[in-house]
Each structure stands twice: as structure tokens, then as C-alpha cells.
Amino acid sequence: MTDYSSKEYLAKVDAFWRAANYISVGQLYLKDNPLLQRPLEAKDVKVKPIGHWGTISGQNFLYAHLNRAINKYDLNMFYVEGPGHGGQVMVSNSYLDGSYTEIYPEISQDVDGMKKLFKQFSFPGGVASHAAPETPGSIHEGGELGYSLSHGVGAILDNPDVIAAVVVGDGEAETGPLAASWLSSTFINPKNDGAVLPILNLNGFKISNPTILSRKSDEELTKYFEGNGWAPIFVEGDDPEKMHPATAAAMDEAIEKIQAIQKAARENGDTSRPVWPMIVFRAPKGWTGPKTWDGVPIENSFRAHQIPVPIDSTDMQHADALVDWMKSYRPEELFTAEGQLKPEIAAMAPKGDKRMAANPITNGGIDPKPLRLPDYRDYAVDNTEHGKVVAQDMIVLGEYVRDIIKDNDQNKNFRIFGPDETMSNRLNHIFDVTNRQWMEPIKEPNDQFMATEGRVLDSQLSEHQAEGWLEGYVLTGRHGFFASYESFLRVVDSMLTQHFKWLRKADEQAWRNKYPSLNVIATSTVFQQDHNGYTHQDPGVLTHLAEKKPEFIREYLPADANTLLATMNTVFQSQEKINLVIASKHPRQQWFSIDEATVLVKNGLKIIDWASTDQDAEPDVVIAAAGTEPTLESLAAISILHKQYPDMKIRFINVVDLLKLRSPKVDPRGLTDEEFDMYFTKDKPVVFAFHGFEGLVRDIFFDRHNHNLHVHGYRENGDITTPFDMRVLNQMDRYNLSKEVAIDVLGDQAGQFAQSMDDMVAKHNQYIRDEGTDLPEVEEWQWTPLR
């Protein structure tokens, strides 16, 4: 029986660590002569070594010990690399365990393959200095710091047999998102979920500053982490001979505590919130590298952060220092002359899927299943009479989502995430069948819908956490959505960017399996935030995402409940997209039949016959609308215009899939010029009522024939005011739209009508200041058929 704590076994762990360190340094500097089997020459060294050293050795040490723990306890474990610029760690270790070569056969486990491995790192046409999608075993690149623990938690939800070993950088730990993510202990259910083992890598320094937590005493850190629901286990030192047994003991203690917690929950029915173990690992930044340079410390200093020895192919003055450093790992003990890891060391790596780099969870998930969807048509609102029914789109969606939860109860592969906004965003019906997952004490009747098990995670007021959990969940093959206030999606728009970048690069890797899409619902929108005011009014996430590569971005603006149902049916079946859905939560008139809604979503837009008077002829004007309030105001404007100018030929177009309007030169899905002209004509005025910033629509029309465009969107005007006044403030109301159309079509002949519209706006302004509510003409307006 193997003694995993014996000196002999730990000596092999040390050898594996040294091999990983050697491979990691080689990737920084060399492009040839990988085993230094001849004197180092300028041609062997990169012109410009790029990369980072400071975090590498400590992480390689942890990786080797996690391998030991996997072997000892037969664990299902994967690795999340939180510290920035640690790209060599997962590359080096996957190369040593063989998984890298299985994916990239040209990077063979011999001298020639090692040469290619070294050269490609941070090299044109090569691989990144992060744990990018090209890296086996990675679900987290770690370019933008702060999300490692959120991703790890998202991954282990509903994966009860999995442990996420999340190494948290001590610089990363200073970010807001990471600091918030320690509260994740409140949400991990040990019965149904896996476990996260956070390992705080306290190497002491960032780019040029000390790290805050590294200067705290063990007592202070213990209080901090215990208050967040974690029991820290400390390991500290710089002597490998002492650090190996200490780290092995710490790992054993942590794993056995996790297993005891899970056993108590699964076999004994313990529903209390556990105190999960974590490891605080204090080892020097740049450990095992050069101690000093030019009389100042390198190891255990910020100076170890990047390239510690100044050597490149044009300056070989200090080549001996690099050679001495690399040979300090005694490569002749680690590799054969042919460049293969010696068998007794290679045997230390876990086998098959037990290798962290080959764990299926990191490549699209463990046995991923498609979402079972009920027929969205069964939840449709009867809109036989357009605008007669008043409903709340998100309430209706909640009925559909409620049944998605029921239909997927057995698979446990669907969750809803949010920052304390699920009820505010009117997803009330989901609580007919589930609860909020919450492991803290529950105090009824003061609390509502709280339980130790539930499909909703919305009880932490952190957009970063909700987004990070969802990312971890979908990157491991499951499904869900994140619903939040539209303006506060800007809090996580950089996270959305990072997820997009992951999707794009992962899609280029033939070996990467597909991911379910990341679905984001923006509600409590800019034109519905009259009660919360200017701070809550920002539709800019539309513009932000539209700037990304179009293959991975979808933006939907359903105008009513039926269109929202058809939209969500589409996005839940999609893969490798970021789907942004702008949805209304307030009572609104309902417009489209479920068949119309289906066509709207399928085609992206539709000429609405019942709201048009062009009778398939060339119109005098095109009125287009994208969004709930833009659609309402456009229809009201059409009513006003038709009453005043019954002979005016108006074409009304509703737009749901906004980016489909773009030219095929920009977006492969875009309408051809012929199709676009069929909708919008080549030269007739287009008055476009838009939910977002106007520049996005102008950009869409730039490559088209028709530049006779007049956009009425959000003009950065807002306040605490009435609902209709929000539209008036931005001239996206029925009166300003009607005035625009009349002037565009009739010119000076529309002067009297334009004045009447200005008079209505003036009347509105006075009325709301007198009465505090909108005009009866607005509040009581109903659609009447045009013919």
C-alpha cells in the first residue's frame, strides 16, 4: 500500500515540481536546446522573452501536491488558476502528465516537442501568458483578475463529486469581485453540490507593491476567513524539504474535512452551513529563482514578477545565470536524454480523466445534457385584439421558466442567478416550484422563499458573483440565466467581454466541446426607471456588446410577453453566444400574436401589417421600433398620424434581433442590401424609435443605401419622474415622433401639426408638475384599428 506521506513519495512529488519549474523557465527564455545538452548560444534564446515568473513556482508546487491528493483520495478535481500571468503552470503540468501532447501531438514528449513547447510560449503564433482556452484543463483565463472563486463555485454547483481547487492570487484577493466571492460559502450545499478548496497564494507581492493580506498576521487572517465561513489551514516556508510534508498534511486535512462535511450532509441529513476548509499558502514570490540581482533581492520581492534575469538573443551577457538557474532543478535527474520525463516521476501524475488537465468538467462539462423546454406557445397571451390585454412580460416569462425548472429537475442542470432582484424583476412564478439556495439561518416569516436547496442563487447583492457563478455553470455544460437591472449590467460588462474573448478563442480549438450560451436578461430598463432616477438609467450594455465579434453576440429587444417567450425559447437552445435580452417588467399593453412573435424572433424583424398603411406599396415613411417603450410610442404615434393624415403611407417595422440589421460585411447573419432595402427602402425617411443610445442605430445604417435616418433613443436625459416623461425627456415619445414624421414627409406643410405636438408636450410638462402623474390621454390610450 502506498504511503503518500513517506519521504520517498514526497521526493517524487519534489521531482515532479522541479520538472514543472524547469519547463516553466524554459518557456520564458528558450526556443532551442531545451535540455541544455550543449552550451547555450544566442540562437537558442528568444529575441524578447515575455512572460512572468513570480507566481509560477508556488503554483507548480501546489499543482504537484494536488496531484498527490488526487492519487491518495481518488478525487475528481480540477484546477482554477486565479493569479495573473501564470500561464506556464497549467501548460507545464499538462505537458508532464501527457494530456497536452494528446491534444497537440506535435508538442511531443521528447526533445523536439519540448523545443516547440518552449518556443511557442508568449511568441507570435504561439500561446498566451495566461491559462487561455488553448490550455488543457482551464475554464478560467485569469487575464482580468477577481473571478476565480466565483467560477470555481459555479462549476461545482450540482456536481456533487467534484472539487474545484481554486488558487487565489494575493493580488487578485484585493479586487472587489474576489473579496465578495468569499461569501460563496453561504451558498454551497454539501448534499447536492461539490466543493471548492480555495488556496490563497500569499507570495507577498504584486507588480511593484506588497500585497495587503500577506502583511496580515495569521491571527488576523483566521478571523477574516472564519467570519466568511472558511477554516484556514496555514502552510508557510521556503525550504522545500520542510514544505513538502507540511503541505501534504494540510492537503490531507482539507480533503478529509470536505469529505466529512459531505458525509454529514448526505448520510446524516445535516442541513447546517458548514465551515469549509481553505489553505493559506505562504511561500516566496519567485521561489527557487534567482535570489538577488545587482545587489537587490529578486526572490521574495516584487522584482520576481516578470523576467528576473535580463537575457535575450541580442544580449547574452548573463547567459550563465540563466543556465545556473535552470540547472539548479537538476534536469538530468528528471528527463532522459531523449527529453522524456523519467518513468518513476511520470508515474506521479494521476491517470486518464483523473488528471486535472483532462477532467471532462473543463471541456464542456461532465455528461452535459440539452435543456428540456416546454412549448413556449402554451404560455402565450391572447392578443387577438392588439393592445387590449395588459400584462407584465417578466411575470409571463416566470411561468415558462417555472416549468423549465420542473422539466429539468431530474437533470439538475438549470439555475437562475441575480443580485437580489429576482422578485423585483417579476420572476415571481418560479418560486411556485423552487427556492433560493441559502445555507445561513432562515428566519420566517421575515424571510421568503429561502431554503438549503433551490434553483435560484440571488441572495448576495453582487452582480460580479451572479455573473461569475453563471459563467462557471455554463462553462461546465449547464444552463441558466442572469437577470439584473439594465443599468447595473454595466458593473459586469468587462466580465461579459472576458467571457466573449474566452468563447472566441475556445471556438478556434477543434478539441474544445461546445458550451451552452450565457444568457443575460436586462430588465428594470432605462425607460422604466422613472422611480429610481438618473443613476438607474443606462442602456449602454447594448452598445458595449455590439462592438464584439458578431458570431458570438445576440441582442434581443422583445416588445411584449409573447415575443419574450419566443426569444427565450431561442436563446435557451443556442450555444456559445452571449444573449442579451432587454425585457419589460411593468404592466404593458400586449401587441403580437404568438405566431407573429415567432416570426419576429426567427427573422429578427417584421413589417407589422396591422399597424401599417402602405398596403405593400412604397411608403412615404418607415417607422421602426426596437424595445418595449419604443414600440408603444411608435404605435401611439402611428395612431396620431393616421388620424391627422389618413392618406400618409406608413410602414411600421418591429425589430427584435437588432444586430441582424447590420450589413453582411459586418455580421454574417446580416440582411443583404436587397433585403434591407425591401424593409427600409433606399431613400424614404426612417424614424427609428430605439431603446438604447442612438449611435448604435446610426452605425448600423452607415453601410446601407438609406441614410435618411432619424433616430430617437436614449439621449442621456433622466430623472425621478413619470414613466411617460422619461420618454419625453429623450424625445422618444409619441408627440416628438409624430412631429418628426410629419416634418420629414411634408416639410413646411406640417408646421401647424408640429406646433400642436409641441403644445401637447407643453401640456404634459405642466400636468405632471401639477398632478404627479401622466396625462389621461397617455394613461388611457388604446390602439384602434387603422382600417
UniProtKB/Swiss-Prot annotation:
Its cofactor is thiamine diphosphate. Its EC number is 4.1.2.-. InterPro entries: Phosphoketolase, THDP-binding, Transketo_C/PFOR_II, Xul5P/Fru6P_PKetolase, Xul5P/Fru6P_PKetolase_C, Xul5P/Fru6P_PKetolase_CS, Xul5P/Fru6P_PKetolase_N, Xul5P/Fru6P_PKetolase_ThDP_BS. GO terms for biological process: carbohydrate metabolic process. The keyword Lyase applies. Gene3D superfamilies: 3.40.50.920, 3.40.50.970. This is Probable phosphoketolase.
